[in-house]
From Swiss-Prot:
Signal peptide: none annotated. ATP binds at G125, D126, V127, G128, C129, G130, K131, T132. GO terms for cellular component: cytoplasm; mitochondrion. The keyword Cytoplasm does not apply. This is Uncharacterized protein C115.02c. Keywords: ATP-binding, Nucleotide-binding. It comes from Schizosaccharomyces pombe (strain 972 / ATCC 24843) (Fission yeast). The keyword Transport does not apply. SUPFAM superfamilies: P-loop containing nucleoside triphosphate hydrolases (SSF52540). One of its GO terms (biological process) is protein quality control for misfolded or incompletely synthesized proteins. Pfam families: AFG1_ATPase. Belongs to the AFG1 ATPase family. One of its GO terms (molecular function) is ATP binding.
Amino acid sequence: MLQVLRVSAPCFAFVDTIGSIGVCRVVRFTTFHNTPIEVYNKKVNDGVWKRDPYQETAVKAINRLYTELESYTQPPITQDSMPAEKGSILSWISPLKKMFSRKKSPTLTSSLPVPGMPKGIYLYGDVGCGKTALMDLFYHNLPPNVTRSQRIHFHAFMMQVHRTSHDLQDRYGFEIDFIDHIASGIAKETTVLCFDELQVTDVADALLLRRLFEALMKYGVVIFITSNRAPSDLYKNGIQRESFIPCIKLLEHRLQVICLDSPNDYRRLKSKTEDTYLYPANSPEVKKALENWFLCYADEKDPAHQDEVEVFGRKIIVPKASGNVAWFTFEQLCGEPKSAADYLSLASRYHVFIVSDIPKLSIESKDLIHRFITFIDALYDTHGKLILSSEVPVQEIYPTAPSEVLSSTADPAAKGKIESHYHGAFGGIEEVFTFTRCLSRLSEMKKQSWIHSP
């Protein structure tokens, strides 16, 4: 089934949720085929971008990939026929054959690269250093012979992977290799695949990615990844991390790893802003301002009402909505368990969000801040607009440095425990790290250019 989703205004994407993985396929119309380095230099000369030696190093690597893609032909993709659906007599025989089979599955490191396949790119660096902009520079200026390309946020991609795996399991049980089938489906429609904001915090994703990346490369898919972390730092201190190490080695071996160590945070360059992040939340003036923002974006033909958004058969209640604007309190948005799929579905349904009454959170509030960060990622990726009210300035709602972590806890014994947790445990440090990235995105989303974009 094909769906049309707004990916980033004013772009649209057709999403096939069953036939393939459902990755967003954005149709690009290009007249001139300049190389990435030519486009970069023009942006610098026109004053659109600031010359940055760190970015120039990355652009040279991107241009290398462009040149290699010009002469690359992806091999034809063949896929085994589907097995009998679950419940048929054949579905009972196959497991017995597998039980007595001594044939070993090929290991990840044993598969060889496709002949002539270009080496992809893994671009990482601090928040706001321009990773996504450079990926877009590459994606929107591919060689004319590359007609099948896809770019997707990592959260959205994994959501579709899990959804497709679930559909296949319902239909065929465990009679097929889900990962290989998904990868071949993507490869049939994709030569270049761009992942934005790769991060691994879930054990299920960690174990799945190891096989998925290998399968994609086996089918000749050239991969470009952006992340805030080096491959060696992915899923650090995570559960069963030793099982993820082969995936790290694979990324380091098959992709050109580039550290974008630019000291500039381009999202925080001076820009005129409007009052969209308001505090203190309990102030009558702030409450009135939020009402005015809601009226500004509301549809007068659609009176404010409670709405519902369905995700995988579940219903998410939207407390107050009108047209393309939705209003949640922080408790309503993040107080109960919600997944990346939930937030992406909300961000696809509404273009403007008002989030009120955000409290100051302690280091122990990992679940709450994780959901908030996931929501901001979904809203940023769909270029949604955000108005919020908080107890304290937004940059203070969660600790961002060890001193803040300790000062948020009064009990000396608890401080020692938290200090140990902060420096040694995966969960606490991960939320502190990702909240720093989140603040950079929030800063960009406050700019006038973002607020007044379509």
